[in-house]
Structure formats: structure tokens, C-alpha cells
């Protein structure tokens, strides 16, 4: 059996860590790919490095891209406040970073083709995407078509698969799977704020804490990290 390789976009959060571990459990070699894009929550990069070491990934690469130079998001522009009043339906919050996932996946495709990887693992999740346009099934489908058209391996019929195993999972299921896979959840980072401790108020903290409470793991909620 030929050993296959997955490029896992590793943010330092629970979703990307779980996707990477599912790939490893399936027998794939996993290379982690993280990005320093000028985000205020730089602590996620340390979480990604810690996870890569803890999970014994084949390799872990961090790319620097300064998306903060033109702003457009409260994650890259500290003059904008992070929303803390809960998720607003039917709106895209200012934590959306213009083009972020599109850029990340493009770099992932380049790395995958160069390293001979057969797929890219994405931790995107449509159930709690907070309105982000680049975490939806139609986005993934369209990007897969582009990936097939824009790469040599795609033209040769051996395209790199954009694989999002958690796309339609509830957050509770993701945490249950993370526990089964023995992922050190306490080492993951979800908070949007650039503070030493999770704020417990941003959308990401709220989604995380709600799911953990529902599965009876309040010990892993933001106030306990």
C-alpha cells in the first residue's frame, strides 16, 4: 500500500486539529501548514506549534503573510472591536478576513503539489461558520473545480482533493471526536482576542463553550483554560 500525504491547514483550533488527527488515523502522513497573517490572536500559532509536536506530525510549516497591512477585519485591524454580543444571524461579522481561506488553500495547493500530497485537510465547518462565505459547501465545491483546473496533477487526472471532514458536523460532535482521538483540547486556541486567556465573549469562545457544556466538559471551557 502506497503511503499517502495530507497537508493539514493547522490554525491551532479544535477543528483543524481534529481534521488532522482523522487523517492520521486513516494512515496518512500529515504535514501541518499554519499562517502568521497579522492576526491579533497570535497565540493560536503557538497552539498550532504545540499541537504539531504533540501529534507528531511529519512536518509543520508556518508561512508569514501580512494581511493586516490593508485591514478589513477586526482580526487584523485592532482599531475595530471584536463583536462580543453573540452571533448575529443573516450577517457576516467583522471577524471575517477578506480572502483568507482562499489564500490559505492556494498556498496549501502549491505545497501539496510540490510535496506529492494527495489532499488538503480543512477544518471548515458550515454549522457554526458565523456567516463566513468561505466556510460553506458551495465555496468548497467551486474551489475544488479551480484546483483541478489550475494544477498539473489536476490536468493529469490526479487532482488534489480539498477534504473537509467536519463540514456538516455539529460542534458537539467535533469535541466528542477530539476526545476520542485524545487531542489535548486544553492546548487548542479558539479565542479571537489577543489576550493571554480566552475572553469567553467572542463568537468563537461562545461556540466552543456552548458545545463543551452540552457534552458535560465545562472543565475545558474558556474560563478554565
Swiss-Prot record:
The record describes how the cofactor is bound as: Binds 1 zinc ion per subunit.
SUPFAM superfamilies annotated for this entry? Adenine nucleotide alpha hydrolases-like
Indicate yes or no for the key word Zinc. Answer: yes
Keywords, A to Z, come to: ATP-binding, Ligase, Metal-binding, Nucleotide-binding, Queuosine biosynthesis, Zinc
Recorded hits in CDD domains, A to Z, give: QueC-like
A single GO BP annotation from the record? queuosine biosynthetic process
Family statement: Belongs to the QueC family.
Q: Which PANTHER family match?
A: 7-CYANO-7-DEAZAGUANINE SYNTHASE
Name by which UniProt lists this protein? 7-cyano-7-deazaguanine synthase
Q: Which gene encodes it?
A: queC
Amino acid at each position: 500500500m502506497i503511503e499517502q500525504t495530507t497537508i493539514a491547514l493547522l490554525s491551532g483550533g479544535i477543528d483543524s486539529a481534529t481534521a488532522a488527527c482523522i487523517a492520521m488515523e486513516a494512515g496518512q502522513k500529515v504535514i501541518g501548514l499554519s499562517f502568521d497573517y497579522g492576526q491579533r490572536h497570535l497565540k493560536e500559532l503557538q497552539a498550532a506549534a504545540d499541537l504539531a509536536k504533540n501529534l507528531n506530525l511529519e512536518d509543520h510549516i508556518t508561512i508569514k503573510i501580512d494581511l493586516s497591512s490593508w485591514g478589513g477585519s477586526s482580526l487584523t485591524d485592532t482599531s475595530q472591536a471584536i463583536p462580543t454580543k453573540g452571533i448575529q444571524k443573516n450577517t457576516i461579522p467583522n471577524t471575517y478576513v477578506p480572502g483568507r481561506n482562499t489564500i490559505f488553500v492556494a498556498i496549501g495547493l502549491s505545497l501539496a503539489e510540490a510535496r506529492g500530497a494527495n489532499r488538503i485537510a480543512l477544518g471548515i465547518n458550515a454549522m457554526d461558520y458565523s456567516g463566513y462565505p468561505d466556510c460553506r459547501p458551495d465555496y468548497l465545491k467551486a474551489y475544488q473545480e479551480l484546483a483541478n483546473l489550475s494544477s498539473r496533477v489536476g490536468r493529469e487526472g490526479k487532482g488534489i482533493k480539498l477534504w473537509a471532514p467536519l463540514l456538516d458536523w455539529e460542534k458537539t460532535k467535533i469535541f466528542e471526536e477530539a476526545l476520542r482521538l485524545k487531542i489535548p483540547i486544553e492546548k487548542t486556541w479558539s479565542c479571537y482576542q489577543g489576550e493571554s486567556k480566552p475572553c469567553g465573549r467572542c463568537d468563537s469562545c461562545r461556540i466552543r463553550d456552548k458545545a463543551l457544556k452540552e457534552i458535560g466538559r465545562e472543565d475545558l471551557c474558556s474560563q478554565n483554560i
